[in-house]
Amino acid sequence: MISAQAVKELRERTGAGMMDCKNALIEANGDIEKAIDILREKGLAAAAKKAGRTANEGLVEAYIHGGGRIGVLVEVNCETDFVANTEEFRNFVKEICMQIAAANPKYISKEDVPQEVLEKEKEILRAQALNEGKPANVIDRIVEGRLEKFYKENCLLEQEYIRDPEKTVKDLLNEMIAKLGENIVIRRFARFERGEGIEK
């Protein structure tokens, strides 16, 4: 028997609907952590279904960090102004601003990395592996593995979420899509850091 308290806790932690929480707990035999994983998997499925829908409402949010040391401007889109005006959506956009301020991504997704940047990175990684004396037959695999690290450092959606390293920003986005029932797109951002690019 699944307790109402467990359902309530799962709802508070995931934002999923009551029946979804109850069913996930039944499937997980009452294990809340396992139920969270089940909901996240289902959330990903829900997010994939919504990905094709047009998102042209949303918010532009500004965030200034550290007494004016770092500034971030971000645009996040959703499908309706109703969702754009919810506290959950606003908080999500603020979280994205803080993520960008703290983790300094260069791109939104892997697909946004220019081909020439990727080729240059692969060249550097290949040279590093050769200099380390790695056998030629495993170099490509090593480069691919290290390229994943490059993506995790430089692509917003691949980064560890600053408040929960178990999640990526993409996981957070997919949870929000599942919770709010609309396609949500992180459209663009700009990050400024005082003194950046100035010769010291």
Curated annotation (Swiss-Prot):
The main location is: cytoplasm
Localisation: Cytoplasm
Matching entries from Gene3D superfamilies are given as:
1.10.286.20, DNA helicase RuvA subunit, C-terminal domain, Elongation factor Ts, dimerisation domain
User: Could you give one GO CC term from the UniProt record?
Assistant: cytoplasm
InterPro entries tied to this protein: EF-Ts_dimer_sf, Transl_elong_EFTs/EF1B, Transl_elong_EFTs/EF1B_dimer, Transl_elong_Ts_CS, UBA-like_sf
Q: Which residues form a coiled coil?
A: none
- Alphabetical list of PROSITE patterns matching this protein: EF_TS_1, EF_TS_2
Q: Which Pfam families match?
A: EF_TS
Q: Which PANTHER family match?
A: ELONGATION FACTOR TS, ELONGATION FACTOR TS, MITOCHONDRIAL
Q: What is the similarity comment for this entry? A: Belongs to the EF-Ts family.
Protein name per Swiss-Prot or TrEMBL: Elongation factor Ts
The organism encoding this protein is Caldanaerobacter subterraneus subsp. tengcongensis (strain DSM 15242 / JCM 11007 / NBRC 100824 / MB4)
